[in-house]
């Protein structure tokens, strides 16, 4: 991650697009040992307002990037405190920085076809905050499909009062535990997905009627055409995972 910049500020000669900012996710706490090692190795004293004893497996791990701002405007190095004010990194530009649009065409015996193709890439977008946090009270809301129980971290088997298994332990899950959304739903690189897309914007099929035919109708020339707009679009399927519900 690039750190040689004025933190979240415009600088001379740089883009006016400050981009998307958030914490840098470096993993997930999957055991109590992970928590102990992270705090010891990085000299962490405060993790998003929590002490080590308050941190739980199933929470995402964020990197301590910098300390407080200094009188000269720069920031101190990592200070053992992870918070959303001083430890953000640039996750992406606001829009894809690269792209192209091209027009193609062909014609044969009065029949022609033209098409406009476009693509953009190099940027990222974030899953909506409501999707990251579980949409409020999960007992009364439909959930995005990526929160399938098979994908969510569970430290140990969970049973109801009658001894029935409700959730099976899943320490190798892809996604963190929903119970800790105050930590896991923070804007971070974990929720960053590619914003690359390609689209077939327009296709026009046209036919020029034979002059021998139309001159009998008193017309010099005539052309019939059919145009389709926004026909095909390819983009990151993760957004569809958000739109679909369990």
Which sequence ranges carry the predicted segments?
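Short, well-ordered loop/turn elements at secondary-structure boundaries
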Residues: 97-99, 107-110, 219-221, 227
């Amino acid at each position: 991650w690039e750190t040689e910049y004025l933190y979240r500020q415009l600088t001379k000669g740089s883009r006016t697009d400050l981009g998307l900012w958030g914490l840098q996710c470096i993993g997930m706490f999957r055991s109590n040992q992970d928590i102990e090692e992270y705090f010891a190795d990085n000299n962490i004293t405060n993790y998003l307002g929590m002490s080590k004893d308050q941190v739980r497996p199933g929470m995402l791990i964020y990197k301590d990037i910098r300390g407080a701002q200094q009188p000269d405007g720069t920031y101190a190095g990592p200070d053992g405190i992870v918070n959303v004010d001083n430890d953000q990194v640039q996750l992406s530009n606001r829009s894809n920085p690269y792209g192209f649009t091209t027009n193609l065409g062909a014609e044969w015996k009065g029949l022609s076809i033209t098409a406009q193709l476009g693509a953009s890439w190099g940027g990222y977008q974030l899953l909506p905050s409501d999707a990251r946090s579980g949409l409020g009270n999960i007992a009364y809301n439909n959930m995005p499909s990526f929160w399938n129980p098979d994908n969510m971290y569970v430290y140990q088997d969970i049973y109801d009062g009658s001894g029935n298994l409700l959730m099976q332990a899943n320490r190798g899950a892809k996604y963190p535990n929903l119970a800790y959304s105050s930590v896991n739903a923070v804007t971070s690189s974990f929720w960053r997905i590619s914003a690359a897309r390609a689209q077939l914007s327009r296709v026009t099929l046209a036919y020029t009627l034979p002059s021998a035919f139309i001159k009998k109708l008193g017309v010099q020339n005539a052309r019939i055409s059919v145009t389709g707009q926004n026909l095909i679009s390819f983009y990151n399927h993760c957004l569809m995972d958000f739109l679909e519900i369990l």
